[in-house]
A protein has these predicted regions:
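Active-site-proximal cap/loop segments of hydrolase catalytic domains
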Residues: 1-189
Length: 189
């Protein structure tokens, strides 16, 4: 039931849980409201961008690691992969909405960070593996292009030989070095 209850709640109640957690930590004095960053990979990258988009005053910075940002492109990819790998990818239509259904398409547009990027106020570090077949590099490129067109601040880091998550020791060290620099720059005292 918990899994099914998440259907069409990406960017909605699922995101509200993250926001509620952050606000709780602020209220408890655990987190400094002026120095909060959000960092996630894959779906967590989507959640990062949703946080920066739908609650732009909550975060000082965000790190999107191999994250989904274009829900329409995700649907196209799921259709392609569904033909290749079978019905598993059909579940994405239940989770993220069916672009052939006008009501679902409204949800897709409303919850797509790429479509709502104009709301972003904080700097973003975009990290991706050029060989990612799950969330293709085009997601990161489209986000960078959109942020450029909007004059938004972002940094870009792509590992040429990594995929959906980094497994190489050196590329992982390089990535976390970039993360450390980015956070030090944007979460100063």
């Amino acid at each position: 039931h918990h899994y099914i209850s998440a259907n069409k709640q990406f960017g909605k109640t699922m995101q509200d849980d993250i926001t509620d957690g952050v606000n709780y930590l602020i209220d408890q004095g655990v987190a400094d409201a002026d120095r909060i960053a959000i960092f996630g990979g894959s779906y967590g990258g989507y959640a990062t961008m949703a946080g920066l988009t739908f609650t732009p005053d909550l975060y000082a910075a965000g790190i999107n690691f191999v994250g989904v940002v274009d829900l329409e492109l995700l649907q196209e990819d799921s259709n392609r992969n569904s033909r290749r790998f079978g019905g598993f990818y059909d579940e994405l239509r239940l989770e993220w909405g069916d672009p052939d259904d006008p009501e679902d398409m409204e949800y897709i547009i409303e919850t797509s960070p790429l479509r709502q990027a104009h709301k972003i106020k904080s700097p973003v570090l975009i990290i991706h593996g050029a060989q990612d077949n799950n969330v293709r590099l085009v997601h990161a490129r489209k986000l960078a292009d959109k942020l450029d067109s909007l004059g938004k601040e972002y940094e870009w880091y792509v590992e040429p030989y990594e995929g959906h998550g980094f497994s190489g020791e050196q590329s992982t060290l390089n990535m976390f070095g970039k993360v450390e620099e980015f956070l030090a720059k944007h979460l100063k005292n």
